Amino acid sequence: MLLCRRARARRPERSLSEGLDDLVARIRACRICRDEPEGAPLPHEPRPVVVPSQRARILIAGQAPGLRVHETGLPFNDRSGDRLREWLDVTRDEFYDPALFAIVPMGFCFPGYDARGSDLPPRRECAPAWRGQLMAAMPQVSLMLTIGQYAQAWHLGDWREASLTATVANWRAIFESGEHPRQLPLPHPSWRNTGWLKRNPWFEAELLPVLRAEIRMRMAAEE
C-alpha cells in the first residue's frame, strides 16, 4: 500500500484526463452484463457506447443505446437523436463535439427487445459499476440533462416525482434547487412520445427556451 502511495506521489503530472482515458478503456472492455449478469445475460456481444469528456460543461444522461446506435457506435444516431438536437437547437457537429457535450447513458449497451418489440430497460449492472467513477471524473460539468425515468431515478433523488410527467413539470424547481450540476429533466425524445408532447404544450413553450439559452451560454464559453 505504501508503495502505491509513493508511486502516485512521484507522478503529480498525471491528469484527470489520463484517468478518464483509462476509465473509458475499461468501460469499452466491460462484459459484466454478459459474463456476470443480474438476471438473464445480454443476448448479444456487448458494445458499450459512451462519450465522456474532460471539457464539456453539458452532460446528456440518457437511457441506453438502441439497435442503430449499437450497430454504428454513435450515440443518438437515430430519429430520437434528431429530435433531441432539435430540442437543443444544435447541429450534428456541435452535438458530437466532446468539447461541448458529454453523452453518458444509464446503460452503455443495447439491452435488446422485449416480447412486444420495444427496447428493454437499461441493464441493471451498468450504472452501479461505472456511473460514480464517470461523474467524479467530470467535475467541470455544470448542466445535466436527465432524459427519461431511469436517469431521473438515479440522479434526481427526492426531486423525482411519482411520474415522469410530474417530474418534468417540476423542472423549474429542480433547475433552481442549487444542486450541482444543475439539472433539467426531459422526456425521452422518442417519436413514440409525440402524443406526450401534444398533451403537454408547456414543455416546448416554457422549458425548451430555457434549455436552449443554457446550452448556448455554455457553448459560447468554449468559443
Q: Where do the model's predicted regions map?
A:
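A polyanion-binding, active-site-adjacent surface
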Residues: 5-6, 15-219
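Short stretches within intrinsically disordered, low-complexity N-terminal or propeptide regions
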Residues: 9-11
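Short intrinsically disordered terminal tails
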Residues: 221-223
